[in-house]
Design a protein with these regions (language model features):
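Glycine-rich beta-solenoid repeat tracts in large extracellular/virion proteins
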Residues: 6-13, 26, 30-45, 50-55, ...
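Solvent-exposed serine/threonine-rich low-complexity stretches and specific carbohydrate-binding patches
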Residues: 229-236
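Beta-strand signatures of extracellular beta-sandwich domains
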Residues: 215-219
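Surface beta-strand/loop "capping" patches
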Residues: 165-209
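Short beta-strand/loop motifs in extracellular/secreted proteins, especially
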Residues: 17, 46, 77, 110, ...
Length: 236
C-alpha cells in the first residue's frame, strides 16, 4: 500500500497467477486508506480473488481504479469474491477514486463474478462499479456482483459518467457491443399466489451481437435505485 504506482502489477507474459488474501490500498487493519495510484493492474490472463472468503482481497482506498484489466493479453482474466471500495468491516467507506474495476484496451472474455461465492462487492467508488471501454473489449461477463453507492453506473459500457442508452435493434459495436439493458414491462403479485412476483420484461438486441439464451439477472436496488445491491435470481 501507499505506492506511487500500482500496488500489484502482473505484466505481459506472466500467467497462472492468483492474487488472493491481500489488503491493497489500506493499512493492515483494513480500516484506513493507504492508497496506491492503482490497486491491481493485469496485463496478462490471471485471476484476482477466489471463491474462498478466507482468501478474499480487500481492494480499497486507491487513488484511481481498484482493478485494471488492460489489453488483449489480459483476456479471460477473472475477478472473484473481492471487496472493492469497502473496509474490513464490510462498510462502504474506502472507495477507490476511479472505477471499482476497469476493463480496457481490448481485454475480452473476462469474468467478473459468477454464482454464489464468486461474486464481488463493489461500493463507494468514484467512478462506475465495472467500466468496460474500448471498442474491441467484448464478451466480458459481469454477473452476480453486489454494487452500490458508486458515483457512476454499476456497469458502464462507455467509460463515460452516464449510462449507455438503449437503441432500437441494438446493432452497434463498442465495449461489450453496447448491449441493451432489459426493459421492465410489468410486475404484479397474483392474488392467488401472494408469495410470488410475476415480471414481464423485454430486451431489444441484435442476435448477431449477443449470446443466446440471454441470462437476465434481477437485483434489489441500492438506496438511489441505480445499481444492483442484492442478487435475487436469474431468468433465461
Amino acid at each position: 500500500a501507499g505506492n506511487t504506482g500500482v500496488g500489484v502489477h502482473v505484466a505481459t507474459e506472466s500467467g497462472g497467477i492468483q492474487i488472493r488474501g491481500n489488503s491493497i490500498g489500506t493499512d493492515v487493519t483494513g480500516l484506513v486508506a493507504l492508497g496506491n495510484l492503482q490497486g491491481v493492474l493485469l496485463e496478462h490472463k490471471n485471476s484476482v480473488g477466489t471463491s474462498d472468503p478466507a482468501f478474499a482481497n480487500l481492494i480499497s482506498g486507491n487513488i484511481e481504479n481498484g482493478i485494471v484489466i488492460r489489453g488483449a493479453a489480459a483476456s479471460e482474466s477473472g475477478v472473484y469474491g473481492n471487496d472493492i471500495g469497502l473496509d474490513a468491516l464490510g462498510l462502504p467507506t474506502l472507495g477507490n477514486g476511479g472505477a471499482g474495476i476497469s476493463i480496457e484496451q481490448g481485454a475480452s472474455k473476462c469474468q467478473i463474478g459468477w454464482d454464489s461465492g464468486l461474486d464481488n462487492r463493489i461500493a463507494d467508488n468514484g467512478g462506475g462499479g465495472v467500466v468496460v471501454s474500448g471498442s474491441d473489449s467484448i464478451e466480458n461477463l459481469i454477473s452476480h456482483n453486489s454494487m452500490e453507492g458508486n458515483t457512476g453506473p454499476g456497469i458502464n459500457l462507455l467509460g463515460a459518467p452516464l449510462d449507455d442508452p438503449n437503441d432500437a435493434g441494438d446493432p452497434d459495436e463498442g465495449p461489450n457491443r453496447l448491449q441493451n439493458t432489459p426493459v421492465l414491462l410489468s410486475a404484479e403479485r397474483p392474488i392467488d399466489l401472494p408469495s410470488e412476483l410475476h415480471v414481464v420484461y423485454a430486451v431489444d438486441t441484435d442476435p448477431l451481437n449477443a449470446h443466446y439464451p440471454l441470462v437476465i439477472e434481477f437485483f434489489r436496488a441500492d438506496a438511489d435505485g441505480t445499481e444492483g445491491a442484492v442478487y435475487l435470481g436469474s431468468d433465461w
